[in-house]
Amino acid sequence: MKVLVTGAGGMVGSHMVELLYDRGDDVIGIWHKNKKNIEQIAKPIKFTQCDLRYGYGIDDIIMENMPEQIYHLAAQSYPTVSWVSPAETIDVNINGQVAVYEAIKKARKYKDSSYDPMVVVACSSAEYGQTLNELDDPYVLETAELKPLHPYGVSKVGQDLLAFQYFMNDHIRCIRARIFNSTGTRKVNDVTSDFTKRAVEAEKTGVYELRCGNLETRRAIMDQRDLVHALMLLADKGKAGDVYNISSEHIYQMEDIVKMIEKAIGHELKRNIDPALIRPTDERIIVGNVEKLKADTGWKQEISMEQTISDMLEYWRNH
């Protein structure tokens, strides 16, 4: 099968192209700004640089390859950046997606009117926003109201609804995947990534201290391999036009993460609480109800947090 992955330079995208290649697919990966993750891939996967906002680039890629599945992962994906650069966030996330869909329409018009790819759009738990603070049950359903609290969340609502309207009006099959917290190798700037990287630095220096924030915070975190597996299952088995949560069902306190790291490295870490790492207010536990995902695809979370941490430690030892 010919498959296109946008955002192939990101954590999820770079792992996805490898897993699709291992499955036997003919994979094309699109990257834009950062090649670091792609340079770590030894497999003979085709990569091309493209800024999706300029439609002629993605037009040519889709017209030439006519992929049967498209995983649209490319995005400005940091909420904090969206506060500083709201216009760019909206531009990249909304207009980039419009360009992908318009390229599909052009391929139908000029090359094959029966062209019928499945488009899996990476949406976000950030779409729920304030609703997460109002619900009694932390396990949020796909039917919950969308009340985003930052420009990034707004842009993801836009992507979500754009996919739906192209499905309804142009009959372009899609899956809208609302993705919750994930981590893994090649991830940067999240708690698990920061802690494992600092632990490896402690191994190298012999100073077993860990700079950290509020260790009582709790998060539902899944391994990026479980996330990629869910996305691949949805492309094959999900109901076209529908929306699905992808979330860990396991909740971890940050102190538990530190203890897992200590066990993995065989050494205790002195906790150095840095006030700069403590948020003035912290969000509630964010967990997605994944019963719909499991019912329609058979997905289940398979990779333990202990395994994720072990793999991340090994990654930082070698990079």
Please name every model-derived segment.
Residues 210-214, 241-244, 253-259, 266-285, ...:
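C-terminal "lid/loop" region of Rossmann-like NAD(P)-dependent oxidoreductases
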